[in-house]
Amino acid sequence: MGVYHGNDLKKPTGGKKRPHQKVKRKYWMGRYPTFTRLDNRDVRVHIRVRGGNYKIRLKRAAYANVIDPETNTARKVRILRVVETPANPHYARANIIVKGTIIETELGKAVVTSRPGQDGVINAVLIEKRSERPAG
């Protein structure tokens, strides 16, 4: 379902504006946000957007491409949990992954650099390596 992103007839003060004489244009329409959630498998959806292009939306995520800045190598690793989301504290509680989210992976903590709802993939940069516990 589309979401109207045009101007409504309310002023910031709460008063009403005069009704505009234009009809609603198709290019004023939008969509609801994707809210990529942590899951045990990846789920991607291909949607057609304006101009006949396609976007890949990541609905559910289990893996991330994590780059280690020390060795400059990338690995596909499992996401263990969502630690913190600076964009919205409620997102971390609901396991929603957006750009800037700090995630716990098999390698350690990483910050998400891609937009999963737009790109269809989670790319992240390692910020804190996981400490190896000695056996015994």
Swiss-Prot record:
Q: How does it assemble?
A: Part of the 30S ribosomal subunit.
Question: Mind telling me which GO cellular component terms the entry cites?
Answer: ribonucleoprotein complex; ribosome
**Domain of life of the organism in this record?**
Archaea
Q: In its UniProt entry, what is this protein called? A: Small ribosomal subunit protein eS8
Family stated for the protein in its record: Belongs to the eukaryotic ribosomal protein eS8 family.
Q: For the region Disordered, what residue ranges are annotated? A: 1-23
Keywords of this entry? Ribonucleoprotein, Ribosomal protein
One GO MF term on file is: structural constituent of ribosome
The gene it comes from is rps8e
Q: Which PANTHER family match?
A: 40S RIBOSOMAL PROTEIN S8
A Pfam family matched in the record? Ribosomal_S8e
